[in-house]
């Protein structure tokens, strides 16, 4: 049973009273809702909020930016999973080529930049059938809006958290199908893992099986708009990833309407049980119906079967191979966030030049750089063994970005447009040597001439040499991935392992939500080894198809952490229990130096800081630099707390430790100003003074 969370507000002030925002209201109905059939899919979330939309009013605001009719931008409001409305500044972001867009002016796509949350970006698709959205968040789950009621008047708002193993889907694209030139180029030092200050646009030929068309109610060519609206919904979300990570946008060509089919007995594709034939059947169809000169990448959507295959990897622009990829769901619902992001973006990612990044199997491509199943788009999160999570996160791994950018730069078919948005400048990060079994933090920095809202993503960049049970993170792992990828955040700092793990006094992190029990996703090394890391910075600029054209840009920097077993673990030894210390008192902090003053770590001094919120932040610097000799007397601030922690960190290095337990600081009473001062028995030589005593003085 799905758990419906209805959000009722006691006061309506969250809903700004401007007329343009009256198209949303919280659903307060008590009757049974006849739901849209997509709600029945296994991957539909268990927790969501419901809102009623006035599509005519919303359309009026959206269409103000169509073809620059009234303005290049406009501000709209959308509900979020907290039950509030937030504002976005939108621009047109058409997924159709000019000919197709002119034929179907009621089917549109938009991008939006967050105003309420400046780090949020929006992708929104519109048609007479309703809207769908995807909101990219920083450091937390993305959010979606999809129709909930059959008449598309009630919408569900939910986060991108999906349940594990409910969709038995498999990508059968073999790693061996990688074009040799890509494999060679991506291993060279001159890799391209950044945007070049431009936008790349490619022509997409999208075919669909009759079963796909029928699912959306189209049984003849007179209903092609229903199919195009569905394709537009999916492509809007997919382009959101391509634009943000690759500075790439796919445009659906008008000739795609010639390869949309409605009758299963006469379409050119086998039934789903024989979908292995679809690669060849699609390629033959596109070659004969559309012509190789008229598209850059071709793909097929099915409705059932639970599979995907790109045909080959990196073969965009290559005649006779570029149109052989397909995606089809296992639950009979070719729509929704699972289908759009986990499957379609994955398969087209192969066609663009990306291999699988998981490491539970080593495909020999040099890019199996994720722990276990992997968690980024080109991984297999939630559908294989050694699952680190129940579902993927909505980004490409840094090595995928490098593969695809390298491949696209070698192709002539993408149209390259110079844009006004500049690429972020990422500052170089030094290499470090650290002791074994000791937490560390990597800190980056970047600037952006346009003032864009930058996000940061630290990822390990080591190819796996072990598989199966040895593919997960381990303290004794000598090579390969030991650190899970996470969503980009607004902070340039990443703690290794996660701060929650460090505060629990642990050196390893278990699986994310929905991952397999026992799978380790992060591990501090207890052996000597080398760890390569890449920091990818995204500027999160939104794509605009109308002048001035714009798209997001990325930049990166690499660094190396060397772990040595000649020192460590470096640990705080006192306080390490729930002691109670008085404010303003002098206390002795101790730590295990563990050989860290000697080469190659060579840490001469440490910094000691205090947290009063359980170790989440350390704003109080007790001593900025003191010899790394294992003991230092400090004076505590007179701040009452029951959640104090001590942090001892290397000066000029990246390693540190935090005390294992919260401790208490009791504030000493301070003397107040006395009151009631009076003089009595005054003589030439003396006087008696009296006043009211101050409690605790």
Give a label for each model feature.
Residues 19-149, 276-278:
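N-terminal prosegments of processed precursors
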Residues 22-34, 154-313:
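Fold-level signature of zinc-dependent metallopeptidase catalytic domains
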Residues 251, 457-527, 600, 607-609, ...:
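Exoplasmic/lumenal beta-rich domain surfaces
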Residues 253-277, 317-394, 459, 463-474:
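The catalytic-center signature of Zn2+-dependent metalloproteases
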Residues 408-425, 561-570, 668-671:
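Proline/serine/threonine-rich low-complexity linkers at boundaries of modular beta-sandwich domains
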Residues 434, 445-450, 462, 539, ...:
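Extracellular acidic, Ser/Thr/Pro-rich low-complexity tracts
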Residues 438-442, 585-589, 685-689:
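Structural beta-strand segments of beta-rich domains
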Residues 669-696:
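Pro/Thr/Ser/Gly-rich low-complexity, intrinsically disordered linker/stalk tracts
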């Amino acid at each position: 049973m799905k758990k419906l969370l209805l959000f009722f507000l006691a006061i309506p002030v969250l809903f700004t009273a401007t007329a343009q925002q009256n198209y949303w209201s919280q659903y307060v109905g008590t009757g049974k809702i006849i739901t849209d059939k997509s709600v029945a899919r296994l991957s539909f979330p268990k927790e969501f909020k419901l809102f009623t939309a006035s599509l005519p009013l919303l359309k009026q605001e959206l269409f103000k930016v169509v073809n620059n009719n009234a303005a290049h931008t406009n501000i709209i409001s959308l509900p979020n999973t907290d039950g509030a409305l937030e504002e976005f500044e939108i621009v047109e972001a058409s997924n159709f080529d000019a000919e197709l867009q002119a034929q179907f002016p009621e089917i549109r796509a938009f991008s939006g930049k967050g105003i309420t949350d400046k780090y949020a970006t929006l992708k929104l698709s519109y048609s007479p059938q309703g809207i769908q959205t995807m909101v990219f968040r920083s450091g937390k789950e993305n959010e979606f809006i999809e129709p909930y009621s059959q008449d598309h008047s009630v919408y569900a708002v939910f986060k991108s958290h999906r349940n594990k193993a409910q969709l038995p889907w498999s990508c059968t694209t073999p790693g061996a199908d990688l074009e040799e030139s890509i494999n060679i180029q991506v291993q060279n030092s001159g890799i391209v893992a950044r945007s070049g200050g431009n936008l790349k646009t490619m022509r997409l030929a999208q075919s669909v099986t009759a079963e796909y068309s029928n699912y959306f109610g189209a049984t003849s060519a007179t209903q092609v708009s229903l199919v195009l609206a569905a394709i537009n919904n999916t492509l809007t979300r997919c382009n959101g990833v391509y634009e943000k990570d690759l500075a790439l946008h796919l445009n659906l060509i008008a000739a795609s309407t010639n390869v949309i089919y409605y009758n299963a007995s006469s379409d050119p594709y086998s039934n789903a049980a024989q979908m292995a034939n679809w690669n060849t059947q699609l390629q033959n169809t596109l070659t004969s119906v559309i012509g190789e000169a008229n598209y850059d990448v071709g793909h097929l959507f099915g409705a059932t079967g639970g599979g995907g295959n790109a045909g080959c990897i990196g073969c965009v622009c290559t005649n006779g191979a570029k149109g052989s990829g397909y995606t089809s769901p296992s639950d009979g619902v070719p729509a929704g966030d699972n289908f759009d992001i986990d499957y379609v973006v994955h398969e087209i990612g192969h066609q663009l030049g990306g291999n699988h990044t998981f490491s539970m199997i080593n495909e020999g491509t040099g890019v199996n750089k994720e722990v276990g199943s992997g968690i980024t788009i080109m991984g297999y999160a939630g559908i294989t063994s050694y699952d680190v999570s129940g579902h993927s996160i909505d980004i490409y791994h840094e090595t995928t970005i490098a593969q695809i950018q390298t491949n696209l730069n070698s192709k002539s078919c993408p149209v390259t447009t110079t844009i006004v948005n500049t690429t972020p400048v990422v500052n170089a990060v030094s290499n470090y040597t650290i002791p074994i079994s000791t937490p560390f933090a990597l800190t980056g920095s970047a600037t952006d001439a346009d003032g864009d809202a930058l996000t940061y993503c630290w990822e390990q960049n080591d190819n796996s040499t072990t598989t199966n049970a040895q593919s997960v993170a381990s303290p004794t792992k000598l090579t390969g991935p030991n650190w899970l990828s996470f969503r980009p955040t607004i902070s340039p700092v990443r703690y290794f392992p996660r701060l929650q793990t460090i505060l629990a006094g642990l050196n390893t992190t278990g699986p994310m939500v929905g991952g397999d029990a026992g799978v380790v996703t992060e591990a501090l090394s207890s052996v000597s080894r080398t760890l390569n890391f890449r920091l990818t910075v995204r500027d999160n600029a939104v794509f605009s198809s109308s002048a001035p054209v714009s798209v997001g840009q990325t930049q990166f920097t690499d660094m190396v952490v060397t772990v040595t077993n000649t020192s460590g673990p470096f640990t705080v030894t006192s306080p390490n229990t729930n002691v109670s210390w008085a404010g303003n008192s002098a206390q002795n902090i101790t730590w295990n130096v563990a050989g860290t003053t000697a080469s190659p770590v060579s840490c001469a001094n440490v910094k000691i800081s205090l947290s009063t919120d359980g170790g989440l932040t350390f704003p109080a610097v007790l001593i900025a630099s003191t010899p790394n000799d294992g003991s230092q007397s400090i004076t505590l601030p007179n701040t009452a707390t029951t959640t104090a922690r001590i942090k001892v960190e290397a000066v000029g290095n990246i390693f540190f430790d935090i005390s294992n337990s919260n401790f208490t600081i009791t504030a000493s009473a301070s003397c107040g100003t006395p009151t009631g001062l009076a003089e009595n028995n005054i003589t030439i030589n003396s006087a008696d003074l009296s006043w009211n005593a101050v409690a605790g003085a």
